[in-house]
Amino acid sequence: MHTVVVGTSGVTASDVLAVARAGARIELSEEAVAALAAARSVVDALAAKPDPVYGVSTGFGALATRHISPELRGRLQRNIVRSHAAGMGPRVEREVVRALMFLRLKTVCSGRTGVRPEVAQTMADVLNAGITPVVHEYGSLGCSGDLAPLSHCALTLMGEGDAEGPDGTVRPAGELLAAHGIAPVELREKEGLALLNGTDGMLGMLVMALADLDTLYKSADITAALTMEALLGTDRVLAPELHAIRPHPGQAASAANMAAVLKGSGLTGHHQDDAPRVQDAYSVRCAPQVAGAGRDTMAHAGLVAERELAAAVDNPVVLPDGRVESNGNFHGAPVAYVLDFLAVAVADLGSIAERRTDRLLDKNRSHGLPPFLADDAGVDSGLMIAQYTQAALVGELKRLAVPASADSIPSSAMQEDHVSMGWSAARKLRTAVDNLARVIAVELYAATRAIQLREGLTPAPASQAVVEAVRAAGVEGPGPDRHLAPDLAAADAFVRAGHLVAAAESVTGPLR
């Protein structure tokens, strides 16, 4: 099994995916253990002094003015975890919880939090054992970080609350720890606060969304090319010299992908000989511009994620010179903004895909295809309602594009009077990405059927490879009406698994 070594300088997106999705094991580097011990010595020294230090010998938030005596500080740290583990609603997915817990461990290992090495090791042990804290959908305002979700994780480290074992069964956390030989942690000064004061949940979901969107944007380029081909469109608009004069990198990449898929097509431009169509509809002609803008949005979001993965988010932090300082780095705005930005791009990519699908089904705009791609229109309805489903998904995508980060609700007696809502932005983006895969699957279903209905014309080799792979995956081709839901589910699974991209790349080579 792959092992991820956590040091003091952050982790990579690949590390997050390996731990969250592939169950990679975690080890702490010697450098990290030394940094943890050094930072802890600073906190211990401050704890021994009479002067109040936030997070070490004071209350929290609006209660930060109260000095806490030494005999109450362990209770203080336990209490902040228990009181902040106040989430409600459905359980959050296992991979999200593993990502946020791993990212909190990343910050702990930076040597900026004052957490003891043994607490960090327990975090790694819990993840390595496949124990997943039960975290709920609602409870984070994205500032001071993802407090409630991280508190539920810290509660598990204490042997309290519920957690899911490696077999998927939810049991009391204390029982699961004991079953795996893991001792619950006894929190000391600052440790409870340090375990829950970060933007790790929203960052983990950003990293996973970017990984999924990398596949989905390639998939969208492929389905756009298939639709262009099925509509007998002109691929001249994909010429690289046209995109070079408007030098957006994402646009050029999408155009190149579509051109690669359409290379050798006997359908694109077929109409030029007898009835020239100078320009295709915007949803076909401008596909690279829309998908490309989304790709550039992803590039910016990836840069933000890269910076956050190298960051140490806590308050207060232990600085290299030994000072312990309060700060505002827990504010989730940098992550929240790009999560919302991505949701807008995802909604528009879904919207343009739905418009292309509708064009394939409309006999007045499909240039010779049967109504709704039906076998016997009137007796058969074809893919009419598949487009309804797609339209419903796009309607939801548009609602999910409303920014969460534009809202802020004050909390903690107005001490925390501006928050990022980054967790909410991440949750709605996760739903949007999920729905985008379904939207692309419907276009794939329609476009492959339409290509097969162009009898006597030869599709591009890459297109033919996609059609054959889709059929092999159990998605039926043209014919009389049948139960569509299984076909749509099979097309959806085909897209999500990356099989669409793999089928096209078996001819084109790697797409951009």
Curated annotation (Swiss-Prot):
The answer to keyword Repressor applying to this record is no
Q: Which Pfam families match?
A: Lyase_aromatic (PF00221)
The protein's matches in InterPro entries, at most eight in alphabetical order, are given as: Aromatic_Lyase (IPR001106), Fumarase/histidase_N (IPR024083), HutH (IPR005921), L-Aspartase-like (IPR008948), Phe/His_NH3-lyase_AS (IPR022313)
Alphabetically ordered keywords of this record: Cytoplasm, Histidine metabolism, Lyase
Pathway as given in its UniProt record: Amino-acid degradation; L-histidine degradation into L-glutamate; N-formimidoyl-L-glutamate from L-histidine: step 1/3
Residues with PTM 2,3-didehydroalanine (Ser) = 144
Where does the record say this protein resides?
A: Cytoplasm
What Gene3D superfamilies does the entry give? Fumarase/aspartase (Central domain), Fumarase/aspartase (N-terminal domain)
The enzyme's first-digit EC class, named in words, is lyase
Q: Which GO terms describe its biological process?
A: L-histidine catabolic process; L-histidine catabolic process to glutamate and formamide; L-histidine catabolic process to glutamate and formate
Q: Which GO terms describe its cellular component?
A: cytoplasm
PTM section of the record: Contains an active site 4-methylidene-imidazol-5-one (MIO), which is formed autocatalytically by cyclization and dehydration of residues Cys-Ser-Gly.
Q: What is this enzyme's catalytic activity, as reactions?
A: L-histidine = trans-urocanate + NH4(+)
Q: Where is this cross-link: 5-imidazolinone (Cys-Gly)?
A: 143-145
E.C. numbers: 4.3.1.3
| MF terms in GO | histidine ammonia-lyase activity
State the NCBIfam families in the record: hutH, PRK09367.1
**What is the similarity comment for this entry?**
Belongs to the PAL/histidase family.
- What is the protein name given in its UniProt record? Histidine ammonia-lyase
Question: What organism does the UniProt record list as the source?
Answer: Streptomyces coelicolor (strain ATCC BAA-471 / A3(2) / M145)
Q: Which gene encodes it?
A: hutH
